[in-house]
Design a protein with these regions (language model features):
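Charged, flexible boundary elements
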Residues: 2-36
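Covalent nucleotidyltransferase
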Residues: 27-147
Length: 155
């Protein structure tokens, strides 16, 4: 799995199509099935697990694993056996309201208050076809307990 290519492809083909929805434009979805989650105001980060190598990168593919060892250790404890790249929002879990600027400050201080709320699978060995299958896999791997440093964002 080429990590940089996967991140770039996700940003160009998936993230660029994210849409903000509120009550005023919800009708545009119509009767289509859709998934939505709380918007966390942090920074988009990618989690890569490849052959027991765990990396946490920002959307520019800069590796912040050394600053986020508390998350890396939690992922190691999960003993994930497949190569997989996930995406989520990195945020300061100690604040009542998430703010992008808090992430920048916390990264420089290697704060253990940072958490990552995973919301999608970028690439995996065992392919899940639908988003629902991907979400179920996220929940199975990481749970949805938002008090932990890493969790699947509830839909």
């Amino acid at each position: 799995m080429d990590l940089q290519t996967s991140i770039k492809s996700y940003k160009n083909n998936v993230a660029s199509k994210y849409e903000f929805l509120d009550a005023s434009n919800l009708e545009q979805i119509g009767n289509q099935k859709y998934f939505c989650s709380k918007k966390i105001d942090g920074q988009t980060f990618f989690l890569s697990v490849q052959n027991d190598n765990i990396q946490i990168l920002n959307s520019s593919s800069q590796d912040f694993s050394i600053n986020l060892q508390h998350i890396v250790e939690q992922v190691k404890n999960l003993k994930i056996k497949e190569n997989i790249i996930l995406v989520g929002e990195l945020f300061d879990n100690s604040k009542k309201r998430e703010r992008n600027g808090d992430v920048i400050v916390a990264l420089t201080s290697k704060s253990s208050n940072l958490a990552i709320a995973l919301f999608d699978i970028v690439k995996q060995e065992n392919i899940s076809n639908s988003f629902l299958e991907k979400y179920e896999k996220l929940k199975k791997l990481f749970g949805d307990d938002n008090t932990k440093p890493i969790f699947a964002l509830s839909q």
